[in-house]
Structures are given as structure tokens and as C-alpha cells.
Amino acid sequence: MRALLIVDVQNDFCEGGSLAVEGGATTAAAISEYLTVEGATYAHVVASRDYHIDPGSHFSARPDFSRSWPRHCVAGSSGAEFHPDFDTSAVDALFSKGAHEAAYSAFEGTDDTGAPLGAWLRDHGVDELDVVGIATDYCVRASALDAAKLGFVTRVLLGLTVGVDPRTTREALDEMRAAGVELAGRPLLEDHDEDVVTQPE
């Protein structure tokens, strides 16, 4: 059974947010359109969100944008909410991550019963996973790598992701490909880089 994992399509990761990725809003809308057309082909649709309460050194007034970041996706804030262009009506389960520490992979998240994503997927008979969301080179990358490591047949639909930077996106694509993740399409980047080449759609 195949499921769709939608990673961190939140206000703070889209234009106007505290850790915005250019193209985030476009990606949110594209995912909603994809769900309208293809959502019924998935046994389950799940989503993750950053949901920070007190993540310690993950937040910094002087972030290095590698290990520390500006405040973002604080639990209960508007920045932690899903972007309004992302229609969540098809989402079966929501997994929150990063409450008290840094968390990039959706597989570090749990649902409102405390069930981790990997266990939830297995319990629901899922063995294949498509991954989309924000950002290609950070949380999408981490989620796809964990999915493959856990034995899920994993595919990233790059046309429904957006990368922060061409260099780190290229590195993420290479790493995912080396881990056996199937890459379909091309990620959205603010400055399109023709060197970011993946399998054609």
C-alpha cells in the first residue's frame, strides 16, 4: 500500500514567515492541486509539522542556519499553522516534531496519541511512500532518508517540493539517490539551477 507524506507546509516556511523558503506558497498550492487529482490513489495521506515548544539551542538570536535557526513554528503560533493554500482535508493523520529538541525528519514526529510515524504507517499496511513538501534540502531530505532506512519503498515527487539553495539541494538529491530513494521531477528553486538534474517526469 502506498501513502503520501506531506512535510512541513507551514506558514513560517513560506513567504512572509520567519524562516521562509521562496516558492513555499506555490508548493503549498501545487500539493493541494495534486491531492485533488491524485489523492484518491493513495491508501493514506499523512502530514508532518514542526511544532516547537522549547527546542533549546535549535533557536538562536544569532543563528548559523546550520545547527541553529531563528524562532519558527512555535507551538500555538500562526507561523506553526499550515499555509492556507495547503488544503488539509485529505490528511488522515498529523505528526508533530521538535517540541523540545531539533527535529528534521517527519519520522521523529508523533501523532496525538504518541504513535511515531513509522509505526503508524506499518500498522496501516503501508510499504511504499511518496514524499513532498518543504524543504527539499532539509526536512524532505531527512524524511526520505529515514523512510528508505526503515524499508519503505520511497519516492520524492520533486515538483511538489521546494529547495532553499541550489548547492544544498544538489547535495540532498545525490544523498537521497545514493540511499535508494527514487527521485521524480525537479525541485522548485528561487534561482533555477540547470545542474539540479533528476529523473524526468
Residue ranges of predicted features:
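A short glycine-rich beta-strand->turn/loop micro-motif centered on a GG-aromatic cluster
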Residues: 130-133, 153-166
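Short, glycine/acidic-enriched loop or turn micro-motifs at the edges of active sites
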Residues: 11, 53, 162
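Histidine-anchored nucleotide/phosphate-binding helix
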Residues: 34-35, 138-149
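Charged helix-capping and loop-helix junction motifs
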Residues: 24, 110-115, 170-173
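Acidic/histidine-rich helix-loop elements
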Residues: 14-23
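Structural recognition of alpha->loop->beta junctions
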Residues: 71, 79-93, 167-201
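Active-site alpha/beta core segments
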Residues: 29-128
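Extreme N-terminal starter segment of soluble prokaryotic enzymes
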Residues: 1-4
